[in-house]
């Protein structure tokens, strides 16, 4: 018996049988060992072959295991285990069977045919569980497809379609695919291309997330429902799994062997199968080693001859990058462009998917949530595409509510923690014997019993709410199951069963569900508070958007409305004087938050003009602090760094071919990460004039294209440019009316900036020079900051009025604005106070009183 003539699979089974015999202390390898080893192989080909021949595989496996337990055992042999006489005879019979069929190698299924002729236990068991010679031979012929076994790996390449593809039509039949709404034109165009005589291979090209794969799933559903032309009826749509094809292909030629087996089976199928290759570009170069062919080249002949009916899908970028380079492959495909659906189409798609997501999460998705998901994702998530980004919002919001349902409500959690705290205290007080402790114990007992009653009431409400939600969820699941059953019955032509379900059971369950929801609503109205949410509304969608982008999308709370109405007062806490500037900025923010501003432009764009140190930069910081409660969302760009022409590339990123192309631009990358921010372009007149050309698009359309060709959204930013232009004029005309000063300054601005740049700015704001009264107020703000630093050391700072007046006097300089005041505070207060602290004159808990007398500042401690 030549074991080298066995196929690899058969050799593996023999080795497994030997191992099995050794493990069970059997002296010989019996036919039962080998048959069980064949049935336990990973790919399960022998098991599926037996099932195809009408054999009950599972009971047969159990019977074989049982028969092995009855075999005699010999302990302590330790030597080589040989083949028994029965098995040797069977293997010879197997060789004969293979020769009859003209095979060059002996395959596993030949052993099954030989085993049927066996007079021993194996043959008896096979016959007992339904094996017949005719059925087994028929099963072998259908698996082989008329092929002879010509190499040792022949078994591995069988049923390649089953191993390396996923049947989409079967998934559609069992209701596992999501419904495909709309996309009729694209599906019709795909069907049209599939019906061509040559080049009948459509490739769906579109941005990621627009629904290319969904179109193929829609085609599979139409084929199952019979809503396709006669030529496509009863065809299968198989999705090729490239990962499975490549996985485990260790040796040269193994991948090609697998792909060849797939193509061979498709050719034998005679056009009854449509192959879907998702991410088509992965075929170009897949499996390519030195001197070997890649998958793309292997597909070309099959595509050209029309043996392979193929639908591809890939993105625009990858199609251009990989497929277009291979002109011979590209010409075999017909392009079908898939555009991003609009907001209305997305709403229709979401309504179609609504039931599936409700069923999965066990929550109710309201119609306002669907509309909000489409509109908010379109407006605020600009770097992705509809409908994918809208579906993500619905999914995440529903998942969040589901998570809330599965965890303990916040109000109960707080009660629980409070009860634990009180019980710990009660145990501690119990050990004390004095009267005060006894009184405290009585109070604690009363408090604990009160909280326990409250907790028990809430627990009852929670249980009732959960049971209502569970009841409606069970009805929904049953409804979904019956609808799938009704569709299957209609397809089979079992109209009696379909009508029973459609006009009997389904309406009955729908009425039951409506009644349950009605009861739930009336129960919710009667019981307050409601402990957990069961609905996804527009507010929940807005929360998800806000969390993902940092943009406040949710409805304004009363507190925020008041905050916006009194915005000027809040900004004036940090910016002294400059009433006109503060008012203009506040108006722009109120316009945008109330929803009246143009959604395609930034919230506001301003040019702040004025002398140094009058509060231009400070107003930007105050604005960032007001909008985001921190200055982290202030993107500050010092335009003096962009004095050369080539420095524009630093703002938007280097173009292709230049060093730093992958890094992105300084401004564009920050805005992509923080789309809701205040952008401060400081000292704008110091930048090269070409920088302003880049800003034109931002100011007009609220977008900028970076060095990598990505569009960055500036629609949720406030853009502020500061400049010292006309500052001398402002100093000279400080006593004049604001409008007069503005007109004079604008004359100088127009000589420096181009008209198209000035024309795109919302407001040019002129900051006037500061007076002595303003400086005194600024001194108070700066001293309060010093007070905060001292408060960390547990000290208080009190500055007398004369000392404050002196500081304002020393720090006042009409040319330099408020900046000299900082230096004055450092020189007059911080420096001497630092010495006093180091000498130990003040300690924690002291109040430091600062007074001015005899020409200098004096510090005294008040304890």
UniProtKB/Swiss-Prot annotation:
What PROSITE patterns does the entry give? Answer: CLP_R, CLPAB_1, CLPAB_2
Transmembrane ranges? none
Where, per UniProt, does this protein localize?
Cytoplasm
- The keyword Transcription regulation is annotated on this UniProt entry: no
**Which residues fall in a coiled-coil region?**
391-525
Q: Which residues bind ATP 2?
A: 610-617
Annotated segments matching region Disordered: 467-490
| BP-aspect Gene Ontology terms | cellular response to heat; protein refolding
Q: Any idea what job this protein has? A: Part of a stress-induced multi-chaperone system, it is involved in the recovery of the cell from heat-induced damage, in cooperation with DnaK, DnaJ and GrpE. Acts before DnaK, in the processing of protein aggregates. Protein binding stimulates the ATPase activity; ATP hydrolysis unfolds the denatured protein aggregates, which probably helps expose new hydrophobic binding sites on the surface of ClpB-bound aggregates, contributing to the solubilization and refolding of denatured protein aggregates by DnaK.
The name this protein goes by in its record? Chaperone protein ClpB
Question: Which gene name belongs to this protein?
Answer: clpB
């Amino acid at each position: 018996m030549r074991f080298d003539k066995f196929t690899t699979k058969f050799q593996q089974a023999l080795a497994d049988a030997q191992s099995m015999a050794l493990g069970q202390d059997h002296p010989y390898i019996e036919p039962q060992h080998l048959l069980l080893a064949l049935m336990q192989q990973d790919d399960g080909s022998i098991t599926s072959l037996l099932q195809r021949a009408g054999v009950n595989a599972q009971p047969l496996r159990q019977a074989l295991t049982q028969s092995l337990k009855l075999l005699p055992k010999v302990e302590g042999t330790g030597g080589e285990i040989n083949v028994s006489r029965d098995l040797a005879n069977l293997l010879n019979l197997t060789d004969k069977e293979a020769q009859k069929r003209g095979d060059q190698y002996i395959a596993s299924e030949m052993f099954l045919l030989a085993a049927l002729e066996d007079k021993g236990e194996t043959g008896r068991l096979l016959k007992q569980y339904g094996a017949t010679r005719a059925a087994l031979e028929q099963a072998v012929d259908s698996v082989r497809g008329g092929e002879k076994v010509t190499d040792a790996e022949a078994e591995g390449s069988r049923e390649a379609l089953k191993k390396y593809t996923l049947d989409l039509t079967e998934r559609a039949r069992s209701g596992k695919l999501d419904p495909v709404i709309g996309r009729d034109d694209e599906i019709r165009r795909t069907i049209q291309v599939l019906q061509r005589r040559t080049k009948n291979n459509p490739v769906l090209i579109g941005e990621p997330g627009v629904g290319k794969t969904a179109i193929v799933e829609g085609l599979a559903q139409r084929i199952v429902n019979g809503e396709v032309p006669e030529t496509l009826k009863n065809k299968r749509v198989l999705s090729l799994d490239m990962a499975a094809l490549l996985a485990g292909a260790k040796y040269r030629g193994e991948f090609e062997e697998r792909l060849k087996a797939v193509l061979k089976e498709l050719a034998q199928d005679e056009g009854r199968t449509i192959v879907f290759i998702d991410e088509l570009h992965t075929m170009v170069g897949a499996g390519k080693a030195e001197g070997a062919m890649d998958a793309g080249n292997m597909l070309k002949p099959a595509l050209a001859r029309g043996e392979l009916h193929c639908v591809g899908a890939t993105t625009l970028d990858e199609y251009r990058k990989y497929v277009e380079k291979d002109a011979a492959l590209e010409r075999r495909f017909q392009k079908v462009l898939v555009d991003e659906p609009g907001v209305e189409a997305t709403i229709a798609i979401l309504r179609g998917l609504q039931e599936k997501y409700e069923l999965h999460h066990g929550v109710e998705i309201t119609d306002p949530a669907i509309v909000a998901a489409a509109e908010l994702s379109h407006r605020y998530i600009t770097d992705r595409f509809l409908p994918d980004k809208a579906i993500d919002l619905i999914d995440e919001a529903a998942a969040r509510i589901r998570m809330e349902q599965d965890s303990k409500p916040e109000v109960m959690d707080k009660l629980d923690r409070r009860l634990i705290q009180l019980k710990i205290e009660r145990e501690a007080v119990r050990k004390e014997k004095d009267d005060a402790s006894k009184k405290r114990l009585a109070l604690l007992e009363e408090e604990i019993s009160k909280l326990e009653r409250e907790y028990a009431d809430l627990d009852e409400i929670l249980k009732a709410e959960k049971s209502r939600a569970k009841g409606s969820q069970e009805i929904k699941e049953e409804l979904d199951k019956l609808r799938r059953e009704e569709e299957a019955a209609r397809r089979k032509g079992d109209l009696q069963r379909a009508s029973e379900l459609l006009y009997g059971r389904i309406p009955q369950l729908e009425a039951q569900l409506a009644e349950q929801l009605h009861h739930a609503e009336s129960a919710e109205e009667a019981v307050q508070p409601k402990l957990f949410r069961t609905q996804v509304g527009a507010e929940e969608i807005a929360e998800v958007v806000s969390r993902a982008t940092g943009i406040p999308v949710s409805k304004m709370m009363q507190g925020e409305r008041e905050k916006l109405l009194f915005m000027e007062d809040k900004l004036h806490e940090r910016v002294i004087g400059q009433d006109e500037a503060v008012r203009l900025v506040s108006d722009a923010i109120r316009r945008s938050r109330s929803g009246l501003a143009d959604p395609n432009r930034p919230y506001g764009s301003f040019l702040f003009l004025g002398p140094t140190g009058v509060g231009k930069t400070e107003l930007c910081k105050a604005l960032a602090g007001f909008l985001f409660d921190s200055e982290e969302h202030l993107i500050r760009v010092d335009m003096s760094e962009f004095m050369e022409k080539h420095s524009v590339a630093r703002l938007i990123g280097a173009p292709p071919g230049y060093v730093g192309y992958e890094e992105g631009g300084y401004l564009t990358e920050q805005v992509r990460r923080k789309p809701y921010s205040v952008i401060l372009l400081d000292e704008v007149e110091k930048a090269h004039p070409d920088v302003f050309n880049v800003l034109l698009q931002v100011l007009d359309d609220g977008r900028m294209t970076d060095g990598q060709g990505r569009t960055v959204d500036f629609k949720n930013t406030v853009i502020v440019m500061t400049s010292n232009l006309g500052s001398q004029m402002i100093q000279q005309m400080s006593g004049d009316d604001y409008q007069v000063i503005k007109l004079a300054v604008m004359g100088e601005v127009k000589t420096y900036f181009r008209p198209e740049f000035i024309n795109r700015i919302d407001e040019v704001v002129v900051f006037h020079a500061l007076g002595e009264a303003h400086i005194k107020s600024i001194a108070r703000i700066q001293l309060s900051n010093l007070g905060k630093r001292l408060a960390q050391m547990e000290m208080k700072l009190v500055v007398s009025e004369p000392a404050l007046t002196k500081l304002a006097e020393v720090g006042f300089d009409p040319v330099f604005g408020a900046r000299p005041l900082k230096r004055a505070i450092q020189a007059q207060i911080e420096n001497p106070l630092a010495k006093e602290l180091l000498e130990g004159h003040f300690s924690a808990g002291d109040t430091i009183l600062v007074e001015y007398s005899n020409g200098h500042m004096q510090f005294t401690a008040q304890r």
